[in-house]
Design a protein with these regions (language model features):
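Conserved N-terminal ligand/cofactor-binding loop architecture of enzyme catalytic domains
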Residues: 1-34, 110-145
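Catalytic core of nucleotide-activated saccharide and alditol-phosphate transferases
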Residues: 101-111
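Short beta-alpha junction loops
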Residues: 66-68, 86, 93-101
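Histidine-anchored nucleotide/phosphate-binding helix
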Residues: 72-88
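Acidic/polar, low-complexity linker and loop regions
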Residues: 25-62
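Glycine-rich anion-binding loop/nest that anchors nucleotide
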Residues: 60-71
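Structured N-terminal alpha/beta-domain signature
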Residues: 1-17, 41, 45, 49, ...
Length: 145
């Protein structure tokens, strides 16, 4: 990563710790877990952070949870960090369960209830849909190869 990106990540990590957004920060070693998770972000996220121009249009992250499972501490830390660096994050929880706020001290989200609650729905396999779309050729590509 470029030095500017590394400095930006470290500044935002420091701010995340200072704000104590994650429950337990400053107690039981939670701050060490926060540091470890942020400094060990997946390579795809780091590359995206480095290549994205936050001044033009903030990046978007959509998280769909159709189960009763509560978001993990690790995922909560990543979400809080990405929110702090400028990501617009949307949780789509059709069940209406409160399975997101467990590890957040501060209210970092705004809740909107839209329509009826839905249960036992499956998330489509977008990778499969993409491969089917790629296999389909247009009329002209079939004619002209």
């Amino acid at each position: 990563l470029r030095a500017e990106t590394q400095d930006y990540i470290l500044d935002k990590l420091s701010e995340l710790l200072r704000r104590k957004t994650i429950a337990g920060t400053g107690q039981n070693g939670t701050e060490y877990k926060i540091i470890t998770i942020v400094l060990d972000l997946p390579k795809e996220i780091l590359r995206f952070i480095q290549s994205f121009d936050f001044t033009k249009c903030p990046p978007k992250l959509i998280i769909v949870n159709t189960t009763e499972t509560v978001i993990s501490l690790e995922d909560s830390i990543i979400v809080a960090f990405l929110n702090l660096i400028g990501f617009d994050i949307v949780f789509f929880i059709p069940t209406g369960y409160d399975n997101v706020n467990k590890y957040f001290n501060n209210q970092i989200m705004e809740e909107h209830i839209i329509g009826n609650y839905l249960y036992d729905i499956a998330i489509p396999d977008f990778n499969r849909l993409r491969s089917v779309k790629e296999k389909k050729k247009s009329f002209f590509s079939r004619l002209f190869g």
